[in-house]
Amino acid sequence: MPIRRLPPELINRIAAGEVVERPASAVKELVENALDAGATKIEVQADGGGLTRILVADDGCGLSAEELPVAVERHATSKLNPGEDGEYDLLRIGTLGFRGEALPSIGSVARLSIASRARKADGSQAEAHAIFVEGGAVGAVSPAAFPGPHGARVEVRDLFYATPARLKFMKSERAEALAITEELKRQAMAHEAVSFALDVDGRRTLRLPAEAAGPDGRLARLSAIMGREFSDNALAIDHEREGVRLSGFAGLPTFNRGNAAHQYLFVNGRPVRDRLLQGALRAAYADFLARDRHPLAALYVELDPSQVDVNVHPAKAEVRFRDPGLVRGLIVGGLRHALAAAGHRASTTVSMAALGGFRPQSMPPPQPSAAGFSAWRQGGWTPSPAAAAAQILPGLSEVSARAEPEALDAYAAGGMAEAASPAPVFDPVDYPLGAARAQVHETYIVAQTRDGVVIVDQHAAHERLVYERMKAEMAEGGVARQALLLPEVVELDPAEAERVVARADELAALGLVVEAFGPGAVLVREVPALLGETDAAGLVRDIADDLSENGQALALKERLEEVCGTMACHGSVRAGRRLTAPEMNALLRQMEATPHSGQCNHGRPTYVELKLADIERLFGRR
């Protein structure tokens, strides 16, 4: 079969399949063009899930009549400029787009129209022009009406009409519209100073006014998109290391979800889905969340464009870092520092969920019987104090039966009569978790604070305390090692074996002693005693994978921490153990002094705080 040159129309359609996978991809490309043009206001309209019509209007710098026909040519762009030596450097890209493929790709599979008015340097208003592209055929430039002083309006109709086979792979109109909404939200998170609006089938579904540039404006934008609960339970992140800066907001461990859909990652203002960044985020929360729970976060990585390659994915959804270990370490370290600074703080949703469990209920009128009442009254009957208490709080009747009958009768008769022995007056102390007042079901500690009540799960709280103490001891004293009776030889790829041996000193500090054993093999002499009977070969292979991918021996650290977590769970105060008042208060004080004590190792809250105002609302006092 002879080799043939493909016609330009077919080449553009092939490129369109890589760049424009669905309507949301077209919206992404057009919105990025608007942002690169300096737009401060972007409006998007989508009909029929974006397949019937897409309109993206902006107030950017616009296009002149001379630029319009060039803009729809493949590989024509204003975003790449040659250096002093005349060479183009793809590793110094400061814009969102750079390939010049979006408009010609869309025009090859749809009916595309661009109307634009360029911004003039002297401030005067230029004439507006338009150009049409249909199935790859480019029309002539003509004068057009344009509502604004400058900017562009790009309209896409009948997307994929020229490639009907692609339509078979589209989802429902509603699903495609949701994908467009999510894409616009991601772009809006990265550019809080730009206002965004979205109309779906003629109905305004998203409106995000411009916010002030900076952390406060960014948090306001995130709150508008991710919900007020996120901003109430978010930790501010701002760390820098060797020219790489990490900023943004991450949720408290107790504020988590069952999937990773609420994790947003950005590199130099570009939304990305990167395995390295997602893995670093997961590793930072490894001490706080179970494997099936995921944190909420919006993280922004900023670094020199020469240190990251954005030209590794057709849709620019993935990036590659020159020093992935540096970026990963910055994310893990920055997040853990913020989590440690949070101390024993737990998410507000924990107390809200607890309050939601309380529902005012009307008691049905009890039926009179031969027992359980003291006297008849007009219009009804008066139960005995013990019976009334049993109706309100089951189990209290036993306590009431042991009380002095005279005191109960006096209470029932007088209602407001003073008790024989007044309750002790609480003198508030400046302890965040208050002073212990009782233990309930030998599992929960009830403490009184200055402005409310704290309920502590004694097992979950002590589990976190033991775990943090074990980690600190391991960091200070090193990891104890145990020698293998028979040293084990582990076969590896020669490059992997070389990487493992090169990190032998680091591994020895973690309790794993290895040495070279010929080409493509390492000899394991000692393993961490904490791991007990472990699969040394599997451990070394996991470490080799980590060194290859991240440049760090993460598998060993994570296994050690996992074992510490298991030991802490078994070595902590169990539910069902009765504690004395000094023991309960000691536990509260340790929680206040220990980082991450607001949640156990599995992400469950260790305590719930109920404010006095909330309790008063439950009883109709507010």
Curated annotation (Swiss-Prot):
Keyword rRNA-binding listed? The answer is no
**Residue stretches spanning the membrane:** none
The answer on whether this UniProt entry bears the keyword Ribonucleoprotein reads no
> Which domain of life does the protein's organism represent?
Bacteria
Q: Name one Pfam family in it.
A: HATPase_c_3
**Gene Ontology molecular function: any one:** mismatched DNA binding
Q: What UniProt keywords are attached to this protein's entry?
A: DNA damage, DNA repair
Q: Which InterPro entries match?
A: DNA_mismatch_repair_CS, DNA_mismatch_repair_MutL, DNA_mismatch_S5_2-like, HATPase_C_sf, MutL/Mlh/PMS, MutL/Mlh/Pms-like, MutL_C, MutL_C_dimsub
The entry's function note states: This protein is involved in the repair of mismatches in DNA. It is required for dam-dependent methyl-directed DNA mismatch repair. May act as a 'molecular matchmaker', a protein that promotes the formation of a stable complex between two or more DNA-binding proteins in an ATP-dependent manner without itself being part of a final effector complex.
Recorded protein name is: DNA mismatch repair protein MutL
Q: Which organism is it from?
A: Phenylobacterium zucineum (strain HLK1)
